[in-house]
Amino acid sequence: MANKKDTKKNLVFKNKKAFHDFTILETLEAGIVLEGSEVKAIREGRVNLKDSFVRIIKGEVFLLNAHISHLSTTHSTYRPDERRSRKLLLHSKQIDKMYSKVTKDGITLVALKLYFNDKNMIKIEVATAQGKKLHDKREDLKAKTMKRETEQVLKSFK
């Protein structure tokens, strides 16, 4: 029974597209405002952060376009929108710091991962990021393949 709890704590949903499309500059951990059925859906793994992004609107931070699908057990009259905007919980100093960075050219806010922390609370990792150009993406792919090949060669000599 203890193993089940441990696996639920370690549920991590990553936004792999963000790591591919952006250069990550700085990360922050934030709380997220959810409804009860959304928490249950996250525990079941019904989350997709692929197209999600973060915006600062009137001094508050929101996660937009994150897909948390509803459960089949929820009543049809009470089904929140799957892609609704969800408020992120941050200190005002953190919001001001992020806002000052975002107003610079080319820097955006991206949701990197959604996970359960040690207290079994759902947290989201938000990053300030700068978009990559096509040649940057190609260089990263080349570096990955070179690293993979060298690891394979080293492994074959062991």
UniProtKB/Swiss-Prot annotation:
GO CC annotation terms, alphabetical: cytosol
Keyword flag Cytoplasm: yes
PROSITE patterns associated with the record: SSRP
InterPro entries: SmpB, SsrA-bd_prot, SsrA-bd_prot_CS
Subcellular location: Cytoplasm
UniProt-recorded Gene Ontology molecular function terms: RNA binding
Swiss-Prot/TrEMBL GO biological process terms: trans-translation
Annotated keywords: Cytoplasm, RNA-binding
Pfam families on file: SmpB (PF01668)
Disulfide bonds, paired cysteine numbers: none
Role summary: Required for rescue of stalled ribosomes mediated by trans-translation. Binds to transfer-messenger RNA (tmRNA), required for stable association of tmRNA with ribosomes. tmRNA and SmpB together mimic tRNA shape, replacing the anticodon stem-loop with SmpB. tmRNA is encoded by the ssrA gene; the 2 termini fold to resemble tRNA(Ala) and it encodes a 'tag peptide', a short internal open reading frame. During trans-translation Ala-aminoacylated tmRNA acts like a tRNA, entering the A-site of stalled ribosomes, displacing the stalled mRNA.
Family indicated by similarity: Belongs to the SmpB family.
Annotated protein name in UniProt: SsrA-binding protein
Organism per entry: Aliarcobacter butzleri (strain RM4018)
Taxonomic lineage: Bacteria, Pseudomonadati, Campylobacterota, Epsilonproteobacteria, Campylobacterales
